[in-house]
Curated annotation (Swiss-Prot):
Keyword Transferase applies: no
Keyword vocabulary terms for this entry: ATP-binding, Helicase, Hydrolase, Nucleotide-binding, RNA-binding
Gene3D superfamilies xref list: P-loop containing nucleotide triphosphate hydrolases
Entry protein name: DEAD-box ATP-dependent RNA helicase 17
Sequence similarity: Belongs to the DEAD box helicase family. DDX31/DBP7 subfamily.
Biased composition (Basic residues): 572-581
One GO BP: ribosome biogenesis
Keyword Disulfide bond among record annotations: no
Gene (UniProt): RH17
Annotated Polar residues bias: 600-609
UniProt source species: Arabidopsis thaliana (Mouse-ear cress)
Chain ranges for the short sequence motif DEAD box as given in the UniProt record: 187-190
Broad EC category: hydrolase
Any one GO molecular-function label of the UniProt entry: ATP binding
PANTHER family per UniProt: RNA HELICASE
Length: 609
């Protein structure tokens, strides 16, 4: 009987493994077959729920275990974090003599943002549950340096860090022990460089020294001559990433996307792999090769669509799409990307207060009926560190929520069960598109990505197509037709334009009424309008010919922030306030001078008498 039950379980497990392998994301092998310690493999399965490795993990883990430098280039959501953390823990848990925190730092993981720093740290903590003597830690901007120095003084075995704060400690924290350093990992390397940390990374590499442990002091537990291992992980490939690879990696193996452009610049190497379906992903990097092609991969299960929306109807279209998403499937999470922090703040306040129908209340006295019946969060770089941490952590645990964010959330963050990504503002570079859409359709799950485009921006689709992204049009008019028309507005049989749709007109009026009913909301709208126009004018390179600020109708831009005034009136109002403030300051200054003059005259007359 027991044998029959065990056989049934094994058959069920084999069927599950085969199903995952067929999905094209998971390998038909186990973590233990990759060479990982049994306890660590059990930890991955029992505590973290990973029954089988992804193809990227199946290919990367054995190569990293072998000690080779590695460049991992794979789509977001393919398990790259586990791919490098698991081999580190495997080596450290079996190290002789046993690793102690007094030995200092053995591994450095460098990440672009604070949120990703915390995310990697949380994953590391779970993996180390059975290996309590290996101490994880992090240092990042926004934290108190004194507390970080105290933690470094005690010792951190695996340290996750943002570039700026790491460089600070390398230069100024004498108690930061890293003489036993064996691994340096650059996670989301493309994002690190896009955020302008290139010079910091160069300094960090110089301060950490050459590829070998040359000190050989008596208390070193890493023998002299042991080669330091560097790993570089990136969702996209470009010239900057290639330059960093040449600077930091020694004769590396590349694991990642199999594309023709890439193979023209790289020579193929096929080391022994645990799974034949993963062998094609290994590439040997030739340091003398031409720069890597700027390319990226997008999960095949991701549905990509665009919305062609006139500027004046953008706000209504966004709210309508969000409402439709949550009415279609209540238990889901959505991330909306904006180009500026002011835009995030305005839309966050708007969604937190906007009622529909206007001034509606539920049966419970004083309870507002909000337009979106879900929690709203925001995330951007100007928020206090504790607020950022709270928003990031709470949104991850919510089942039904929307997150409004700048690109700070596009950098490798893993939000469970995000079903849709909305790019309300186009990314500054076409390559940034992949980071944003990578927040959904992770580890084989389905996802949807929506991109808002004005009619004058439609050529942006051609730019995306150059990089392998193909989008179909979203049926916005059909979605708008689903909503009931409030009041006595007649339903038109055939709506000629988006702006003339009864739902759009009624919703726009209600939004403008809210903005003008509250001075704070109006101020947020003005700030968002100004920063959005400035950001639009800042597009560079090939995108400058697509996003032309002179082609914008600024009155329609104002409308997209629920402002009734023409931009000239908004600007004039702001100009008047500025002139009035300067005039008041001049008057105060003149009054002060008069008082001093009168005081001085009185003193002189007293002296004369």
């Amino acid at each position: 009987m027991k044998r029959a039950q065990q056989s049934a379980r094994e058959t069920k497990q084999e069927a599950k493994d085969a199903s995952k392998a067929k999905s094209g994301l998971f390998a038909s092998c186990s973590f233990s077959s990759l060479g990982l310690d049994t306890k660590l493999s059990d930890q991955l399965k029992e505590r973290m729920g990973f029954e089988a490795p992804t193809l990227v993990q199946a290919q990367a883990i054995p190569v990293i275990l072998s000690g080779r430098d590695v460049l991992v280039n794979a789509p977001t959501g393919t398990g790259k974090t586990i791919a490098y953390l698991a081999p580190l823990i495997h080596h450290l848990q079996g190290h002789s003599p046993k690793v102690d925190r007094s030995h200092g730092t053995f591994a450095l993981v460098i990440v672009p943002t604070r949120e990703l720093c915390l995310q990697v740290y949380e994953t590391l903590e779970k993996l180390l549950h059975r290996f309590h003597w290996i101490v994880p830690g992090y240092v990042m901007g926004g934290e108190k340096k004194a507390k970080e120095k105290a933690r470094l003084r005690k010792g951190i075995s695996i340290l996750i860090a943002t570039p700026g704060r790491l460089l600070d400690h390398l230069k100024n924290t004498a108690s930061f022990v890293h003489k036993n350093l064996r691994w340096v990992i650059f996670d989301e390397a493309d994002s690190i460089l896009e955020l302008g940390y290139g010079k910091e990374i160069e300094q960090i590499i110089k301060l950490l020294g050459s590829g070998q442990n040359e000190q050989g002091e008596e208390d070193d537990i890493v023998p002299k001559g042991i080669q330091k291992q560097n790993l570089l992980l990136s969702a996209t490939l470009n010239d900057k990433v290639n330059d960093l690879a040449k600077l930091s990696l020694d004769d590396p193996v590349m694991i990642g996307l199999d594309n023709t452009k890439l193979q023209q610049n790289l020579s193929i190497e096929s080391p022994a792999a645990p799974d034949s379906d993963a062998e094609d992903m290994v590439i040997h990097v030739n340091k003398s090769a031409n720069p890597l092609s700027e390319d990226y991969g997008i999960p095949s299960q991701l549905v990509q669509r665009y919305l062609r929306v006139p500027c004046g109807a953008r706000l209504v279209a966004l709210l309508s799409v969000l409402k439709n998403l949550f009415e279609r499937e209540a238990s889901q999470k959505v991330v909306v990307f904006f180009s500026t922090r002011d835009a995030v703040d305005f839309h966050y306040s708007l969604l937190s207060e906007f009622q529909w129908p206007p001034n509606s209340e539920t049966e419970e006295e004083g309870t507002k009926e909000l337009f979106l019946k879900c929690k709203t969060f925001r995330l951007h770089g100007s928020m206090e560190q504790e607020d950022r941490r709270s928003a990031f952590g709470t949104f991850k645990t919510e089942k039904q929520a929307v997150l409004l964010s700048t690109d700070v959330a596009a950098r490798g963050l893993d939000f469970p069960k995000v079903r849709c990504i909305i790019q309300y503002d186009c990314p500054g570079e076409a390559t940034e598109y992949v980071h944003r859409v990578g927040r959904t359709a992770r580890i084989g799950e389905k996802g949807e990505a929506l991109l808002f485009l004005q009619p004058i921006e439609i050529d942006y689709l051609k730019e995306l197509k150059k990089h392998g992204a193909s989008l179909t049009e979203y049926p916005l008019m059909k979605v708008l037709d689903k909503f009931p028309i409030p009041g006595n507005m007649p339903r038109i049989k055939k709506v000629l334009s988006l702006e003339s749709h009864p739902w759009v007109i009624s919703l726009q009026r209600a939004l403008e009424s809210l903005t003008y009913a509250e001075p704070k909301m109006k101020s947020l709208a003005k700030n968002a309008f100004v920063s959005w126009v400035r950001g639009y004018a800042a597009h560079k390179g090939e995108l400058k010919s697509i996003f032309v600020v002179k082609k914008l109708h600024l009155g329609h831009v104002a409308k997209s922030f629920a402002l009734r005034e023409q931009p000239s009136l908004v600007g004039k109002s702001h100009h008047k306030e500025t002139m009035k403030r300067k005039r008041d300051e001049r008057q105060k200054g003149q009054q002060g001078k008069k008082r001093k003059k009168m005081s001085g005259t009185g003193n002189r007359s007293t002296q004369k008498t």
